[in-house]
Swiss-Prot record:
Organism (species): Rattus norvegicus
SUPFAM superfamilies the UniProt entry points to: FnI-like domain (SSF57603), Growth factor receptor domain (SSF57184), TSP-1 type 1 repeat (SSF82895)
Domain CTCK: 273-347
GO cellular component: cytoplasm; extracellular matrix; extracellular space
Similarity comment text for this entry: Belongs to the CCN family.
Location of this chain's protein in the cell: Secreted
Protein's name in the database: CCN family member 4
Domain TSP type-1: 215-260
Domain IGFBP N-terminal span(s) in chain numbering: 45-118
MF-aspect GO terms: heparin binding; integrin binding
Alphabetical keyword list: Cell adhesion, Disulfide bond, Glycoprotein, Proto-oncogene, Secreted, Signal, Wnt signaling pathway
A UniProt-annotated Pfam family: IGFBP
Main function: Downstream regulator in the Wnt/Frizzled-signaling pathway. Associated with cell survival. Adheres to skin and melanoma fibroblasts. In vitro binding to skin fibroblasts occurs through the proteoglycans, decorin and biglycan.
Lineage: Eukaryota, Metazoa, Chordata, Craniata, Vertebrata
Length: 367
């Protein structure tokens, strides 16, 4: 076993030399020194609301077209900030002009912003995206419009009443090669016959029509329900009573009842409804910061406490002139309510397809 001793000593010597060389050649480890970064100054947001509220005795007098609203602190009446004005938690933008406070330019405080215009959102129908305000035709029978996330459609195929005099048994049938249905009489089924024509000579004599258009079928659809159950809304209809005899959409403003007035206390004892409510004083109509040139004392539909809906029964359309603080004035058609009644048939005014449910091919809108 003596012959193993030299070899063992040699191996130990080689290992020791290797460790010494590795230690000598390896870089000296550096010590990492972490220096803490200086802390940023604490961001302080100014406080624009003070409690308890301190309001002036009289509300401010706002310029013509500027809304008088409650401030963001829910304390005092202020004149709403307009487009491009600075806005804060207290000084809010004019909601009647579709403005909101954009704080993106005041990072990272987000305390003072600028009043900007609200941009309506688009719509998606059958996987196709449409921008706000865009009109499109999903098929040849309907024309649709995207309005702030909601799609509203109007039928393009106008269906006048069937003829009563010369047609014995009228039938509403599809015609090959045409999109819309037409009235057909059994006495002459080989070719479709039109309904009673609009006598344009009477309109020409009154100056309403400058040129006579043959084969013009006069049609005016009923007004759609008001888009809101309270406050300012809009209703539409389709009519081709014009010089071109072309179907056009007409609109009018509507206000069934005020949102900020509780009509229920006005119901007499023992009664279940109040058909008509009328304010005591005449006021001006306001629209997008513009004010009507004259005052009105309109009638509003009341409320029913027995699950019935109070809707207009007799009404008409009037023209109201508005004056704006900047720029020329304009006129709008407005619903004028004469009488209301409580009806058991209640429907959601925002259901834009409610009037189409009675159509046999209602499902074609989504095809």
């Amino acid at each position: 076993m003596r012959w193993l001793l030299p070899w063992t000593l040699a191996a130990v010597a080689v290992l020791m030399v290797g460790n010494i060389l590795a230690t000598a050649l390896s870089p000296t480890p550096t010590t990492m020194t972490f220096t803490p970064a200086p802390l940023e100054e604490t961001i302080t947001r100014p406080e624009f609301c003070k409690w308890p509220c301190e309001c002036p005795q009289a509300p401010p007098r706002c310029p013509l077209g500027v809304s008088l609203i409650t401030d963001g602190c829910e304390c005092c009446k202020i004149c709403a900030q307009q487009l491009g004005d600075n806005c804060t938690e207290a000084a809010v933008c004019d909601p009647h002009r579709g403005l909101y406070c954009d704080y993106s330019g005041d990072r990272p405080r987000y305390a003072i912003g600028v009043c900007a215009q609200v941009v309506g959102v688009g719509c998606v129908l059958d996987g196709v995206r449409y921008t706000n305000g865009e009109s499109f035709q999903p098929n040849c029978r309907y024309n649709c419009t995207c309005i702030d996330g909601t799609v509203g459609c109007t039928p393009l195929c106008l269906s006048p009443r069937p003829p009563r005099l010369w047609c014995r048994q009228p039938r509403h049938v599809r015609v090959p090669g045409q999109c819309c249905e037409q009235w057909v009489c059994d006495d002459d089924a080989r070719r479709p016959r039109q309904t009673a024509l609009l006598d344009t000579r009477a309109f020409a004599a009154s100056g309403a029509v400058e040129q006579r258009y043959e084969n013009c079928i006069a049609y005016t659809s009923p007004w759609s329900p008001c888009s809101t159950t309270c406050g300012l809304g809009i209703s539409t209809r389709i009519s081709n009573v014009n010089a071109r005899c072309w179907p056009e959409q007409e609109s009018r403003l509507c206000n069934l009842r005020p949102c900020d007035v509780d009509i229920r206390p006005h119901i007499k004892a023992g009664k279940k409804c109040l058909a008509v409510y009328q304010p005591e004083e005449a006021t001006n109509f306001t629209l997008a910061g513009c004010v009507s040139t004259r005052t009105y004392r309109p009638k509003y539909c009341g409320v029913c406490t027995d699950n019935r809906c109070c809707i207009p029964y007799k009404s008409k359309t009037i023209s109201v002139d508005f004056q704006c603080p900047e720029g020329p004035g304009f006129s709008r058609q407005v619903l004028w309510i004469n009488a209301c009644f409580c009806n058991l048939s209640c429907r959601n005014p925002n259901d834009i397809f409610a009037d189409l449910e009675s159509y046999p091919d209602f499902a074609e809108i989504a095809n």
